[in-house]
Amino acid sequence: MPQLLGGRLKDVLIVVLVILLIASWGYFFTRPKPPTYKRLTDPEVLVIAMDTSDAVSLDPARAYELTSCLVVNQLYDKLVDFAPPDYTEIVPEVAESWEVLPDGVTWVFHIRKGIKFADGTPLNATAVAFSIKRVIKLKQAASWVLTQFGLTEDSIKVIDEYTVQIKLGYKVAPRIFLSCLSFTVGAIVNPKEVLAHQKNGDLGSEWLTDHSAGSGPFILEKWERESEIVLVANEKYWKGTPRIKKVIIKHVPEPTDQLLLLEKGDIDIAWSLTSDQIEEVREKPGIKIASRPAFQKAYLGMNVGFKPFSDERVRDAIRWAIDYDAIIKMLKGGAKKLQTFIEEGILGYNPATPYYRDVNKAKALLAEAGYPNGFEVELMAPPSYPARDVAAIIKSSLEEIGIKVNIRLVTAAEMYEKYRKQGHQLILAEWGADYPDPDALAKPFADYRVKQLAWRNMWYDDYAANLTEQAAVEFDLSKRLALYKELTEYVLDKGPYAILYQVVNQIALRTWVENFEPDPTFFLLDLSRVYKESVYEVVP
């Protein structure tokens, strides 16, 4: 009996084992397959879509357009820079320290040791002196940023291997000169490479149009015009190799095309979407908006040479007539209220906004000035967004007080050519600071002697011009701020402008892009700080 039981038990165990084996085979062949993942983006490559058609040259001595300046800042270092995210504090870069001698015009810069250009050549005082002299000698459009201080080639001297002396032509508030050195013309180029590619005494300018010779975080790999600009990481960068190994700036002029590429994930950053498009994608999964007030403003210029505008009361009437709120609402986050010529974020910003839409007050001022029935005027504006829409609101506002406005939409090139010859009546334009200091705004808006905006609008006001000069040479910061407060209020009340709004930069990007912050200018953005997260999706 026990033997029989043992045999049956053995048979049962064999059957169970067979069943388990069959079940395991079945599971093996029918079990769910492990998911397959697809990487959505390369974390080492940053792709930006923007209109690059403005770029003329990537030579720091010639770069003066948005695209050119943005790229140059990735390729080169300067003596000083502005610290993000506020861009209000001037910090050392190539120069580790500096001092102004007692004469108030002689500056001594001590160069940081250990910095090398991308080809391994040491960056020293000779390179710094060569770069600044090169800007002065080439006399390109942006050179005025440095030559305005009376600099000549003889003004720059090498004291020793890591010390440079720069002697200005006159005393100036230290912050102004340092701010100007942060602009692209302050970039330090490699004399060895530049002179090796010199043609007919051009100091390598033709070669530098589409090559780089810097010590910055990136190196220019190629520039295919109307196609793309490609940068690769500088493995020898003295601050450390960027996490992004390649930056591709694609030429995509149409915002609609930028939007489609962003939504598909083919690009990381869409540089210039319209306000409507920004609103459209604001809540879309995988996309975020980076925004900050820019050092740029839109304004209405009134030519004092046009008889009605020679009367301050007429200019004031226009300021009271404009529907500022309607303009800002139309721009959907792309603008904020500003009525003085120094933008928020720049030293000397005056938050005063006394003007609002008051039709009755505007009509009364017109009548008092002798224009109870208004007059007819031409408003020049570019045909692009948002200028044409802002012009329409201004037209509607002014016609409500009896001023008939004929809008003339012309290309920016034609408009500015006429503007520079004082050939307008009303003009809708934008202006940004060439360097982040109030002097960069006070001179054009208040000093007609520099032949910029005040001169173009035929506003020859000696009080405003003298106040501008006084502020520029004031070393005491508190006194300088007081001068700019007085000047901004004076121009607000007496000047030939209606400041409409401060531009707010809004840039759409994929959520996998980290540490990207729009800078308030077009030349301080540092892409070496940006990185990308790896993002995957399950393949069906």
Labelled PLM ranges:
Residues A83, V232-E235, R292-A317, A321, ...:
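A bilobed periplasmic-binding-protein/Venus flytrap-type ligand-binding module shared by bacterial periplasmic
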Residues E96-A141, Q165, Q258-L261, P308-S310:
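Aromatic- and charge-enriched surface segment that lines or borders ligand/interaction sites
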Residues H110, W144-H197:
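Surface-exposed binding/hinge segments that line
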Residues A83-P85, S182-P242, K246, V359-N360, ...:
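Gly/Pro-rich hinge or "lid" segments in bacterial periplasmic/extracellular proteins
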Residues A49-P102, K133, H211-S215:
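N-terminal lobe/hinge region of extracytoplasmic solute-binding protein
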Residues T67-L70, E224, A321-Y349, Y385-K395, ...:
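Detector for C-terminal structural segments
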Residues E206, N234-E280, K404-N406:
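Ligand-site clamp/hinge motif
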Residues F218, N303, K336-E368, S384-D389:
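Structural transition elements
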